[in-house]
Amino acid sequence: MAEIAVEVVYALPERQALLRLSVPAGTSAREAVLLSGIAEAFPGLDVQGCPLGIFGKLLARPEERVLETGERVEIYRPLIADPKEVRKQRAARARSEREGG
């Protein structure tokens, strides 16, 4: 069976990893993460259940998404802060600064 070249990436604030590997054609995004062995470098990483994406787009079903040559599978972490709440806080600060502080 033919092999394709893909990348698997994961980043923490203090450390990042980009792994290039060859996988059999027909490999899913989840399978590529498992084959990469990235869990060995990041012991707390749940490779079975973590959200995955390709080039910044979240995959609804990474177990079913078959990879193409050159694609980068991204492993996503949970958000530290709720984006809506951060925007509200930023708007409130800006409003109070406009009103004189």
From Swiss-Prot:
Lineage, broadest ranks: Bacteria, Pseudomonadati, Pseudomonadota, Gammaproteobacteria, Pseudomonadales
Similarity-based family: Belongs to the UPF0125 (RnfH) family.
Protein name (record): Protein RnfH
Organism: Pseudomonas aeruginosa (strain UCBPP-PA14)
Pfam family of the protein (one): Ub-RnfH
HAMAP family, sorted: UPF0125_RnfH
Cited InterPro entries: Mopterin_synth/thiamin_S_b, RnfH, RnfH_sf
